[in-house]
Amino acid sequence: MAVVLTWPTLKQPWTTIPGDIGDPPLQAWQVAWAGHALVTDPLNLWHSNTFFPDLYTYAYTDIVLGYAPAGLLGHGVAAAIFRYNLLYVLAHALAFVGAYALVRQLGAIRTAAAVAGVAWAFAPWRLAHSGHLNILSIGGVALCLAMLARGHGWSLRDGHRPALHRPGWIVAGWLVAAWQLTLGLAIGLPLAYFLAGTMLVVLVAVGWARWRTGTWLLGRRVVLANLLGGVVFGAVLIWLGTTFLRVVELNPEAHRDLSWTEMFSPPLLGYFVAPADSWLWGDHFAAARAQLSWPPEMALLPGVTLIVLAVAGLSYSTFRVRHRVLLALGVLVSGALGLGSNLVGQGDPGYLTLSRLLPGWDALRTPGRLMVWTSLLLAILAAGAISEFGRNRPKLGWPKSVSAVVLLLPLLLVLVEGVNRTPHPAVPTAPPAFQAAADPMLVLPSNGVAESDIMLWSTDGFPRVANGSVTFLPASQQQIRAVTTTFPDPGSIAFLRQVGIRSVVVLPDRLAGTPWDGLPARPVDGLGITREEIAGAWVYRLD
């Protein structure tokens, strides 16, 4: 199913990539570098081959470190692209599996769980993030919650059943949660705070029960399983958190103030607007998208079918009324937080309050991504309604074929809403000059446009390059760009040698309109360097 609903991702998996050629090549490099570092020098994982000579460059942006084992498969650029495409499909598949498992554990029937899984994994809003593998990789969120609920013998339908305690599932749930952290804190940090809040509620409930009845709700093995799993989860969170803090310490320009959050905060309208890549709704919402200042982060439609079913699930459901009320409150709270600064009071109280109070939250500059949680809660509400209908089918007196069609209709509708028309551009190939240059090297132009391509090209042997692409401009990269606008001249050559750069690769077909326009025509006589033209590109050797 994931292959079909993400098609044509696996049609030409070695040469094309879903979304665009901005972030996907960068994340393909991330996976490749993680696998490379895992087997060659794991202690220097954070010090990648890009942004030379800086340190901690692997943590310059949100990472997908958890996919490192995939980075062991194959080598070179084509393998990196294939790997990315495969993970892209598997990320959708795992999101379905996670939501399906969670909703089943909560007490829904299989058909309802399938609807919830498809609606969550292939929601229209996610099509706007076809170029963000870290945002698409949400399966661990639902899966860890399913495992933890199962381990604690808890469901919405049957409540807490101590006889069904399974410590092994608890440990597994915490390990999956820890793995989810390694796929990026954009999704992982809200999960961490949700788990922390849930633990606090459970502790209060356990203490209250002990005070009232004199008994413990959780046995020793359950407590030990939570301690073991929680310690691993906490250790991973601290490891990642301190690394990112180190990046900010070394690069103060990496700090994001609340103006970023204000810029990416969606209006209420955004919750009812589909992205352009939605096959069913894309054209229909074109006019509405034009009203959004940044549609990729503001077109947040979770699905018309999902909304209708969730509303029905408020009054008609297999789940208890109090649970439905809590789910509805969760939808409202997460939806309100997702508005960012567009909530009443400019997001304070609200998302901006969390940015000021919760460690790390200020780095989450895109409030609309909380739709991960809003849509999951909507999916659970929807599953409650479908489950109630499914269990009451025999009492309705309808022909079996009719009731079966009615039961399967929501599944068909969410499948149709998940159909994409995502572009799959061809990835630019590395010029022979790139492979011929000695590292450390600099590729010009270095203006942010082609930096992701260069990072991807470097997966063939991982030569050290001064290039790289992130959402902030490191001071060292800014200085290199500024100094080399006059390259080749004595000053720029001396500077590059001092930094440690041995080669400069110039791509003439990309120079137009940049500060390096006309660079190949500049003379090199008397500068103590050599240059060679290779297949239309130039290699300048400084040593």
Show which residues each predicted segment covers.
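Membrane-embedded helix bundles of polyisoprenyl
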Residues: Y88-L106, R110-R157, R161-V206, N226-F233, ...
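Extracytoplasmic
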Residues: L409-D543
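Signature aromatic-anchored transmembrane alpha helix within multi-pass, membrane-resident enzymes
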Residues: N226-G234, I380, G384-E417
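Hydrophobic alpha-helical membrane-interfacial segments at the cytosolic entry of transmembrane helices
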Residues: M1, V176, G214-T242, L258-M263, ...
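Membrane-helix boundary/interfacial segments in multi-pass membrane proteins
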Residues: A128-I135, R256, P267, A286-M298, ...
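Membrane-interface helix-loop-helix junctions at transmembrane boundaries of multi-pass membrane enzymes
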Residues: W208-A225, A310-G350, R393-S401
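Membrane-interface coil-to-helix junctions
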Residues: A2-A95, A123-I138, S265, L269-A288, ...
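Periplasmic/ER-lumenal interhelical loops and adjacent helix-loop junctions
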Residues: I21-A37, G234-L314, P359, A363, ...
